[in-house]
Amino acid sequence: MNDCSDYTIRPARAADQAGAYHVCLKTGNYGQDGEPHYRDDPDALGRIFVGPYLAFEPELSLILEDPDGICGYAFGAFDSKAFFARYESEWRPGLCAQFPAPLGDPARWTRTQQVHDWYHHPDYFTPEPYEAYPSHLHIDLLARARGRGYGRRMMEQVMDRLRQRGSPGAHLGVSMLNAPAFGFYQRLGFRELIRVGSGKEGCIYMGKRLNND
């Protein structure tokens, strides 16, 4: 087990993509290891939840690293609507061209096919009122990096950067099946805004004000 002093938080670089995609895979099963579910396309989730942030929001992207490599990341998007618009025009067309929409009964799709369907039919969430929580955040840590305080530090650093740029608030989504993450966000000061769906498809959206209003 690595000592806490072995961990480094640093700005993300384009060269971090492969390592960050791996973190996304290893946390891609409701916070647990998703590798068994995506053996046919290990980068499927990373193309949605990592790549666009490294490309479009590098100043709001942080990497957690230890001697064994990249073990976590935290990403932010200053204006979610602008981010999604850029994703729609600059990122998603390439995904759709490379990965055809799956056919057949959706109930029989693999996890990978479900993600490939997301490429073609994305679901963009923005909170109401949008002006209160226009930014959004995303974080994942490998198991070896959890419980050391680095997740909190990374989130606080990204929120500080958002605050300095004038964001009044941020939101994020967490699976209803990921109770540890929900508790983590509560301890960071996020409060529940709305629940969408249920079970494996259910998501809890949470928000936090970044100013003193």
For the regions a protein language model found, what residue spans apply to each?
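Conserved N-terminal entry element of GNAT/NAT acetyltransferase domains
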Residues: 1-15, 212-213
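Conserved beta-strand in the GNAT
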Residues: 63, 69-78
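Conserved GNAT acetyl-CoA-binding A-motif
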Residues: 133, 162-174
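Conserved GNAT-fold acetyl-CoA-binding loop/helix
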Residues: 29-49, 86-100, 104
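Conserved acyl-donor/pantetheine-binding loop and adjacent beta-alpha core of acyl/acetyltransferases
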Residues: 81-138
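Conserved catalytic-core motifs of GNAT/GCN5-like acyltransferases
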Residues: 81, 171-174, 186-206
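Active-site rim helix/loop that mediates acceptor-substrate recognition in acyltransferases
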Residues: 38-61, 67
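Conserved active-site alpha-helix within GNAT-family acetyltransferase domains
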Residues: 132, 137, 148, 152-153, ...
